[in-house]
From Swiss-Prot:
Positions that bind alpha-D-glucose 1-phosphate: Y116, G182, E197, K198, S215
Pathway listed: Glycan biosynthesis; glycogen biosynthesis
SUPFAM superfamilies referenced in this protein's UniProt entry, alphabetically: Nucleotide-diphospho-sugar transferases, Trimeric LpxA-like enzymes
PANTHER family found in the cross-reference section: GLUCOSE-1-PHOSPHATE ADENYLYLTRANSFERASE, GLUCOSE-1-PHOSPHATE ADENYLYLTRANSFERASE-RELATED
Source organism of the structure: Pasteurella multocida (strain Pm70)
A GO molecular function held by the record: glucose-1-phosphate adenylyltransferase activity
Pfam families xrefs: Hexapep_GlmU, NTP_transferase
Gene3D superfamilies in the cross-refs: Hexapeptide repeat proteins (2.160.10.10), Spore Coat Polysaccharide Biosynthesis Protein SpsA, Chain A (3.90.550.10)
EC number: 2.7.7.27
Keyword Calcium: no
Protein name, per record: Glucose-1-phosphate adenylyltransferase
The organism's taxonomic lineage, starting at the top: Bacteria, Pseudomonadati, Pseudomonadota, Gammaproteobacteria, Pasteurellales
Amino acid sequence: MEVIMNSSIVKLPNKYELVKDTLVLILAGGRGSRLYELTDKRAKPALYFGGNRRIIDFALSNCLNSGLNRIGVVTQYAAHSLLRHLQNGWSFLPAERGEFIDMLPARQQIDDSTWYRGTADAVYQNMAIIRDHYCPKYILILAGDHIYKQDYSQMLLDHIHSGAKCTVGCIEVEREKATEFGVMAVNENLKVKSFVEKPKDPPAMVGKPNTSLASMGIYVFDADYLYDVLEREVSSPYTSHDFGKDILPKALEEGVLYAHPFSRSCMGRNTEGEIYWRDVGTLDSFWQSNIDLVCENPQLDIYDQSWPIRGNPVQTYPSKFFYKKENARPVDNSLISGGCVITDASISYSVLFDRIKINEGSQIDHCVVLPQVTIGKNCKLKRCIIDRHSVIPDGMEIGVDLELDRQRFRVSSGGVVLVTPSMLKKLNGEEVASEAHLD
């Protein structure tokens, strides 16, 4: 395809050439501090989601579905479970065809620093490998901790057609929630006119006083431009080594920053045509995003085979339900993964991961239960997140009396109760030793 740019005819690559010349970098080193104990021993991208997936599976699946198969995963905090997941579930790309998912852990490279100092520094510290070994023309940078379906090839096409050197993915959000994002304004050609990172008073969109245009943390760069701007930025005494705070403002200042609306490349909309993108960075948002999946027509369709979300499901026996009571309605509007054993218990509006045992008389209502949990007899759990390997003793009630729960567990601002094995051990007076979290 040929277009006119700056009074010259330029031949643009087609989609196949474009994805072949693109390296994807997934930033997966975040701790997720607002998830508290849920990410104490695992990186946020390694957190379970949707019954038998992990959060990073969405970014990785989007890449493969978009035709992108040259991928680097940049890791840092508590990376062991993430690395095991990638090795066990994502090692199938054929290296002989130039396809790969490589791990890029934080390590001593440029100077004596061993930790990445920010999102931009995570790329800068690996720049020699990227430039000299992978040799891309374009670099797609993704966050590894968001839930969504997107065709990145469309964003890449928009990037080259606009003549941008940097393109940022954007989505409309409620203005009152935009304080957690970078917020921008664009002209009719989607060239970014202003950008501010996490403003206290987010600017509204023209004609939409209650809506702001927010960054999704997804960026496409011309590789040569990214190398240049990172080299210049690292020498600045005022840099915070962050894409939103430093790199995007620099691209804006130089007039090469464009926006890509998520609506142009969103995949898997529901029957109402709604787009879906979630940052599950809090206990409430993590719980709600999982519970949303149990409704009849969820915004996120995890059963859509036209845009599949791959993962590393555990090999288990089928789940078993055993009920002695007649006319019982044991399971209602719930997701139940493999290897679960449910005996005379009621489950409603809940997501159960693999290998969970629930004993007779227990009631599970609006709960997200992570793998290998045992729930005793006659328990009552409501609006809970139960972390992996937890053992709930007979007769325990959680989510019924939030004041009592605040003394025993962690209660979110939205009234969701987080329960972990360590909390239960402390409650029983057991000593809690520091232990590796192999999940």
